[in-house]
Amino acid sequence: MDFLEAEGGWNLSFSGSGYMGLYHVGVTQCLRQRAPRLIQGARRFYGSSSGALNAMAIVFGKSADFACSNLLDLVKLVERLSLGIFHPAYGPAEHIRKKLYENLPDNCHILASQRLGISMTRWPDGKNFIVTDFATRDEFIQALICTLYLPLYCGVIPPAFRGQRFIDGALSNNLPFSDCPTTITVSPFNGTVDICPQNISHSLFELTAFNASFQISTRNFFRGLKSVFPPKPEVVADHCRQGYLDALRFLERRGLTKEPVLWSLVSKEPPALVEGPRGTGHDQGQKTGPTVRWDIPNVLVKDVPNFELLSPELEAALRKACKRDFWTRVQCSVPGKVLAYLLLPCTLPFEYAYFRSRRLMEWLPEAPDDLDWMRSILKSTTLEVYSMAKSWLLRLGSPPGTRADSGLLRQQRGTAPSGNRPLNHRWFPGMD
């Protein structure tokens, strides 16, 4: 890998993946343990949505226990709720904001500036922004909330950042700088990414959307469902372990580790060295060296009888984060679930009123700005609809000859409709 020879000559980019974001934690732990130079010498860490949280954890030097416990706490919260993500108590943005204020240091904005790049989508034009400079701690936390804010899933009013409204960065740029030859990309979805799961059966079809490529397969489809509808904590933990194994495969195929760990899991001795130029299959588009060891096997979590031998720290963090207290075990048991559903007609109205009232009280300080924004959006939409209706009615009521003459006159004058004129976009300071 030529670009790894220069210190600070590469970046790491983590895709948005919702609850599948624990996959990034496994990848990060493998890089820290097997190839720490890739983490220590990286110039910048980019991320969108949940990938930005993992990039933040790397910049601040957070342990695997910190990342696993915070994400799996939210998964266990959804597991306890009788209606899952549809329960009125479910508020991912509020939960993450609270955790950020509790755990981030006072100088987090200074530590993150020029080291962390957060992808955000401006509402309503959908333009992508990558913010790398943060003025205050509150502004940094607000940027993280913006890149995590999936419309309707997290709420209906997009959060504000520097006077504008932003939503999930994965909707416009899911894998920042993935086309840069010095960027190592990571995604829990199979596609043209450096570190990602490898499907057993290869798909001939590929979907390119949101600046990322995904193979069209049933496995990717179910991974997408798990990213918004979290499964049991143990299943999410297995995706974290798979991230560790996929990162290890990436390192061994490119000769960045000396020990043939993956071959020791499936056989006693590795075969003869098989090197070849970059192929056109799963790893197409990866920015690495001239040769790749394609003989390195793809190992799944089920093939590893004792994951603790590979990474004791990660395994201990996952087991600790998956533990449930007594009351949670009662709620998640079959009798507890049956009782919760039987009492749902009685408890749901009170729970709905309580949680909605609490969110209303929390929203009141931001109500004036949000109402002004809603009024401006309604006004601009009304004027646009009125203008379109007016022009349509005028064209409908004018004779055909008049419409042709007006079009010819405009063509002779060399004017064009205003909709074809280029727009001037304003970028934030510190943008790449």
Swiss-Prot record:
Motif (DGA/G): 168-170
Residues annotated as the enzyme's active site: 49, 168
Keyword Hydrolase: yes
InterPro entries found in the cross-reference section: Acyl_Trfase/lysoPLipase, PLPL, PNPLA_dom
Keywords in alphabetical order: Hydrolase, Lipid degradation, Lipid metabolism
GO terms under biological process: lipid catabolic process
GO MF entry, a single one: triacylglycerol lipase activity
EC number: 3.1.1.3
The name this protein goes by in its record: Patatin-like phospholipase domain-containing protein 5
Short sequence motif named GXGXXG, residue ranges: 16-21
Coiled-coil region list: none
Chain intervals for the UniProt region annotation (Disordered): 404-423
Occurrences of domain PNPLA (ranges): 12-181
Residue span of motif GXSXG: 47-51
Annotated function: Has abundant triacylglycerol lipase activity.
SUPFAM superfamilies (alphabetical): FabD/lysophospholipase-like
Presence of the UniProt keyword Lipoprotein in the record: no
Swiss-Prot/TrEMBL catalytic activity: a triacylglycerol + H2O = a diacylglycerol + a fatty acid + H(+)
